[in-house]
Regions:
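Hydrophobic alpha-helical transmembrane bundles of multi-pass membrane proteins
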Residues: 2-226
Length: 226
């Protein structure tokens, strides 16, 4: 008996496509004219767009992006220029010639010191919130952003829907830099560089971080008072 011819291999059947979920198929309706005006108001009041009670729609207003971030970066650069070179040129012109370099060094040194403190602890102590409800929460914000953990290009909606959190943190850093640098005018020609750095290290934790949190922090005791 003649051997049978081998049957051709069957093609593998394609795997069935996953069933679409209702949430994936759902599409928010386009915004009406009234809802677009509502979104514009949310933009100026820094609240979430596209939501009004139980109604939701596809907002036409962009979230954090290049335009908003670019404007804030320009603002941050201008604030930094107030310190470097603004303050050291101003204070340098008020002291004797032999102390000009001392004032310049103090301003530059403070900028570096505060930048490191802000990255490591400062931003979290001012704008964090996981200390809320505790005694420590009346003084500092929280520890969730230590070393900029979780500080990404996504907005921190406790403070701004339209800005990346890392850009917001950089902008706030500029104020943390210029504030202790203003004190240099009171101690010019009176303190050594090392003494200034040690004094400002303590001053940031004892004065600036608690006060900034109380006024600007989402859980600050004086937030919204003015």
């Amino acid at each position: 008996e003649a051997p049978k011819a081998a049957e051709p291999a069957k093609a593998a059947e394609p795997a069935p496509a996953p069933a679409a979920t209702p949430a994936a198929d759902a599409k928010l309706p386009d915004a009406t004219l009234e809802q677009r005006v509502f979104d514009l108001e949310t933009y100026f009041n820094n609240v979430a767009p596209g939501v009004d009670g139980d109604k939701k729609w596809a907002t036409k207003i962009a979230v954090a992006g290049p335009g908003h971030n670019a404007f804030l970066m320009i603002c941050a650069a201008l604030v930094l220029f107030m310190t470097l070179p603004g303050l050291f040129l101003f204070y340098g012109g008020l002291v004797r010639a032999k102390n000009v370099l001392s004032v310049v060094a103090q301003c530059f040194g403070l900028a570096g010191l505060v930048a490191l403190l802000w990255w490591a602890f400062g931003y979290s102590l001012v704008f964090g919130k996981n200390f809320g409800g505790t005694f420590l929460g009346h003084i500092f914000g929280g520890s969730e952003y230590f070393f900029f953990a979780g500080v990404t290009s996504a907005p921190n909606t406790d403070y701004a829907y339209w800005l990346s959190q890392n850009v917001f943190a950089m902008y706030q850093l500029m104020f943390a830099i210029i504030t202790p640098a203003l004190i240099v005018g009171a101690i010019a020609e009176r303190m050594k560089f090392s003494a200034v750095m040690l004094f400002m290290l303590g001053w940031m934790f004892l004065v600036y971080f608690p006060m900034a949190h109380a006024i600007w922090g989402i859980t600050g005791d004086m937030n919204g008072v003015w």
